[in-house]
Amino acid sequence: MTTSTGKINLLGLTQPEMEQFFDSIGEKRFRAGQVMKWIHHFGVSDFAAMTNVGKVLREKLEAVAEIRPPEVVSEDISADGTRKWVIRVASGSCVETVYIPTDDRGTLCVSSQAGCALDCSFCSTGKQGFNSNLTAAEVIGQVWLANKSFGTVPAKVDRAITNVVMMGMGEPLLNFDNVIAAMKIMMDDLGYGISKRRVTLSTSGVVPMIDELAKHIDVSLALSLHAPNDELRNKLVPINKKYPLKVLLESCMGYMSTLGGKRVLTVEYTLLKDVNDQPEHAAQMIELLRDVPCKINLIPFNPFPHSGYERPSNNAIRRFQDLLHHGGFNVTTRTTRGDDIDAACGQLVGQVNDRTRRSERYIAVRQLSADVELQDSAASH
C-alpha cells in the first residue's frame, strides 16, 4: 500500500507481494526474502541497517519504499504482566493491542479496525462506532511493535509472542483482505513463523466471509456466541438478526470440515449477570452445541461505564461452567487479565480518541443497513 509519502510500505506485504514489488523495480526475487527477514525477524525499519543488501539497492529502496509501523501513543503494564499499547494509525484513529503472558505462552490480541460497526451491547469498542479499517501494515505492525518492545527475535525458541488472536478492536471479517494478508505474514517463516494452530480469528458471525475464509487461509476459528438462542442474541449481538444461529453454526462447521483434520471451534461466551448466566441458558447452550466439535471459553463480563450490565457472582460463574461440563463440554473460564489498565476483554476503546464520536462513514453504514432492512420488510408484505 502506498502511504502519504507516495512510497510503498513494505511492512504489510506478503511474500508473493514482496516478490512482485522487487520484480517491478527490476531486482531479483530472492531480495524479497532478505528484506522480509530484516523487517520481521529483526525489527528493522531503516534500509541502511540491512547489511547484506548492497548500497545501490538500499538507495533505490529508499527512493520508492519505506517501512512504516503505526505510532505508539502509550504503553501500560498491568500488575499481572499484561501489556497494552495504544497505537495511532494513518486515519488518525487509535486502536489498542494487548499482550497476555502465561506460564506456557505469550498471546498477542490484535485489532483489525478502529472502532466497530457491529454494536454488540456489552462491548465498549462497539460504543464508539466504526471509524476505519486498518491496513495490512497496521495489522501486522502491531506484532512488529510488540516484538520491538520486548526486544525479541521471532525466530528464536524463547520468543515472547507464541500466539496471536484476532480478538482486539473490530470485526476481522469486515476487513477481510487486510486481515488475511497480515495473518499470512504472521505464519510465514520469513515473517513471524507462528503455527497456523496458534493464530486464531474471532468473529461475531459474518457468515458470507466465514464461507470465504477457507479459500484463503487455514487458521483456528473462534465464534463470539454470547447467547444460546436467537431472541437473546438478537439483542446482544445485532448481526444475529441477519445471520441467525442455525445458519451461523452451519457456516462454522463448513469451515472446519473444508480444512479437514480434528478441528475444534472455540466458542466465546461473555457471562452477564441475570441476562445469559442462568441454568436454562446453560441447558439451551448444551442443546445448541451438541453436534458441534468445540471448546467453550466463558468470559465473565468486564465492567465499563454506562454499560448497563454487571459481572455475575463467582458462584454463578462456577455453576454455569459446571452445568456445561456435566453436559459433556470442555469448558474453561477466562481469568480476567489487565483490567487495571482497561485491557480486559470487551474494554478496548482506543481511549485517546473521543469514544462517543461516530464517523460519517459509520453513520452511512448504519443508515444503509436500516434502508436495506426496511426494503426487505416491505418486500415481505
Curated annotation (Swiss-Prot):
**Which GO CC terms are listed, alphabetically?**
cytoplasm
Name of the encoding gene: rlmN
Protein's UniProt name: Dual-specificity RNA methyltransferase RlmN
Active site (UniProt): 96 (proton acceptor), 345 (s-methylcysteine intermediate)
Q: Per the entry, which co-factors are needed?
A: [4Fe-4S] cluster
**Which Cys pairs are S-S linked?**
109-345
Gene3D superfamilies referenced in this protein's UniProt entry, alphabetically: 1.10.150.530, Aldolase class I (3.20.20.70)
Question: What does the entry give for GO biological process?
Answer: rRNA base methylation; tRNA methylation
All residue ranges annotated as the Radical SAM core domain in the record: 102-342
Q: Where in the cell is it found?
A: Cytoplasm
Q: Which family does it belong to?
A: Belongs to the radical SAM superfamily. RlmN family.
